[in-house]
């Protein structure tokens, strides 16, 4: 059985499968959920709250306002001025300075 997470949105309740989430985009108290089928869901929850409900390793926080599903990660660029990820959907998202340092350290571990 797949893990279903149930949320209330503007039109009622929505059931999400964490593995089908492409990325999250937070804006204050709201979070836009982008699914792999192209659907978008707006929730009145913070990105931190949603990340707390997800199984470990499902989503990776790359900045204050973005989290991605590492399954759909195609490329990571960690140069001094250019820090971003490219997703399978073709989207390009900036990585924060602090998260870039964490990602560098993780990539150097054996």
Feature locations, PLM:
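Basic, polyanion-interacting recognition surfaces, primarily
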Residues: 1-110
């Amino acid at each position: 059985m797949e893990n279903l997470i149930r949320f209330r949105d503007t039109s009622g309740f929505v059931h999400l499968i964490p593995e089908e989430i492409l990325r999250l985009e937070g804006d204050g108290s709201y979070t836009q959920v982008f699914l792999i089928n192209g659907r978008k869901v707006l929730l009145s929850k913070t990105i931190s709250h949603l990340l707390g409900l997800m199984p470990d390793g499902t989503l990776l926080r790359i900045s204050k306002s973005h989290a991605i599903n590492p399954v759909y990660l195609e490329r990571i660029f960690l140069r001094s001025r250019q820090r971003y990820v490219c997703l399978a959907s073709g989207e390009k998202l900036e990585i924060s300075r602090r998260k870039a340092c964490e990602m560098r350290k993780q990539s150097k571990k054996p």
